[in-house]
Regions:
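Conserved short strand/loop->alpha-helix "switch" segment adjacent to the catalytic nucleotide/phosphoryl-transfer site
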Residues: 10-19, 23, 45, 96-126, ...
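Short beta-strand/loop element within the Bergerat-fold HATPase_c
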Residues: 139-151
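Short acidic helix/loop segment immediately C-terminal to the autophosphorylated histidine
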Residues: 12-13, 37-49, 74-75
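Glycine-rich nucleotide-binding loop
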Residues: 141, 163, 195-201
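ATP phosphate-binding glycine-rich loop and adjacent ATP-lid/helix-beta elements
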Residues: 166-193
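Amphipathic, heptad-repeat alpha-helical coiled-coil "signal-transmission/dimerization" linkers
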Residues: 1-5, 9-12, 16-19, 23, ...
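Short beta-to-alpha transition helix within the HATPase_c
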Residues: 53-61, 65, 77-94
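Acidic ATP/Mg2+-coordinating residue in the GHKL
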Residues: 159
Length: 206
């Protein structure tokens, strides 16, 4: 019995090491892709294409940050949502030259599986706010709250911008991604209101 227990412990430790190494390699591969996109972007003098490539770059970065955190931590099953979301917020703020304050209150851990979807959703919400919600040279505010208890989670995102144009909303890839990730991957209840700026509420269980 003692030998079997020791063998199981060794096997689990080896599995943990392999998974951490996998996260490290995935992160490095994503960083290479990001670098290639950035180099290509620097060679192009077209603002629309520049924004498109930056958006793609940030989507990959959102996934890369998660793999980086999973590699750094002792556990690979959960991630600190505050630490993860801070990285995404910082990335978006550096990518777009807008005077927008991002105020956030995030206090929970997330499973690594849910975290990848939440990170991508947050990335798209922030991208939409920074790109479309505010007129050029006008300041704005984004509020994010995210809490979890007993495997029940609530994400509330809002900005005080112009709101969504219904026609743009239907054709927006970013909004389509948000709805697909929220409803099909997280199995979340989703509510979007656009009366004064934009407010998005997500609720789901794990």
């Amino acid at each position: 019995v003692s030998n079997k227990t020791n063998n199981l412990i060794i096997a689990l430790e080896e599995k943990e090491i392999l998974l951490k190494e996998l996260n490290h390699r995935v992160k490095n591969n994503m960083q290479t892709i990001i670098s290639l996109i950035r180099l290509q972007n620097d060679e192009i003098n077209d603002s629309k294409i520049n924004i498109l490539l930056t958006t793609i770059q940030n989507r990959i970065s959102a996934m890369s940050h998660l793999h980086e955190l999973l590699y750094q931590k002792d556990t690979i099953t959960f991630v600190d949502a505050n630490e993860y979301f801070e990285k995404i917020i910082s990335e978006i703020k550096q990518s777009f030259e807008h005077d927008i304050d991002v105020i956030y209150d995030i206090n929970c851990n997330l499973s690594s599986e849910s975290a990848i979807y939440c990170g991508l959703i947050l990335n798209e919400l922030l991208t939409n706010s920074f790109k479309h919600a505010f007129d050029e040279n006008k300041s704005g505010i984004v509020n994010i709250s995210f809490f979890g208890k007993n495997k029940e989670y609530k994400l509330v995102y809002s900005d005080n911008g112009k709101g969504y144009n219904p026609n743009i909303k239907k054709s927006s890839l970013g909004l389509t991604l948000i709805e697909t990730l929220a409803k099909k991957q997280l199995k979340a209840e989703m509510n979007i209101s656009t009366n004064e700026g934009v407010k998005v509420k997500l609720r789901w269980k794990e």
